[in-house]
């Protein structure tokens, strides 16, 4: 159940239809598609808080930063109250997680519920 998720933190997430699904459909890697399997298809105002992290737009895979930026923009357009986007300058798809961990940690600290 998607409503049970406490927070979303995609690291360089592919938010259009995944490249493997597109390959199975006979599409090329640079042919963008959005269907029901794509996270972009499911953007809504009332989902969990989301921290979107991408590497440098010039170093990421196949326009991944632009996907992340569009994902973020759609959350803002539907009125989502807690969506954040970070672009990590100088980091590519392979090394961006290292720079993302402090952001992840801070996001969790800010959003976790205190259990007594």
Model segments located where?
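C-terminal catalytic histidine-bearing segment of alpha/beta-hydrolase fold enzymes
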Residues: 53, 65, 69-116
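Solvent-exposed loop/turn segments at secondary-structure junctions
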Residues: 14-17, 56-60, 90-94
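Short, proline-enriched alpha-helix->beta-strand connector loops that line the catalytic pocket
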Residues: 3-6, 44-50, 78-82
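Short amphipathic alpha-helix initiation/capping segments at coil-to-helix junctions
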Residues: 32, 61-64
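Surface-exposed acidic, glycine-flexible loop patches that form ligand/cofactor-binding
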Residues: 1-2, 40-44, 112-116
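Primarily recognizes the serine-hydrolase "nucleophile elbow" in alpha/beta-hydrolase
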Residues: 1-35, 39
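Short beta-strand/loop motif that positions the catalytic acidic residue
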Residues: 46, 51-55, 60
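Active-site-proximal flexible loops/turns
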Residues: 19, 45, 96-100
């Amino acid at each position: 159940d998607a409503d049970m998720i406490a927070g979303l933190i995609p690291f360089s997430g592919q938010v259009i239809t995944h490249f493997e699904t597109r390959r199975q459909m006979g599409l090329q890697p640079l042919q963008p598609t959005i269907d029901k399997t794509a996270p972009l298809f499911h953007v809504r105002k009332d989902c969990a808080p989301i921290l979107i992290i991408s590497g440098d737009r010039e170093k990421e895979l196949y326009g991944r930063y632009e996907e992340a930026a569009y994902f973020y923009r759609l959350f803002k357009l539907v009125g989502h109250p807690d969506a954040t986007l970070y672009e990590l300058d100088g980091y590519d798809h392979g090394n961006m997680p290292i720079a993302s961990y402090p952001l992840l940690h801070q996001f969790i600290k800010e959003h976790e519920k205190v259990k007594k």
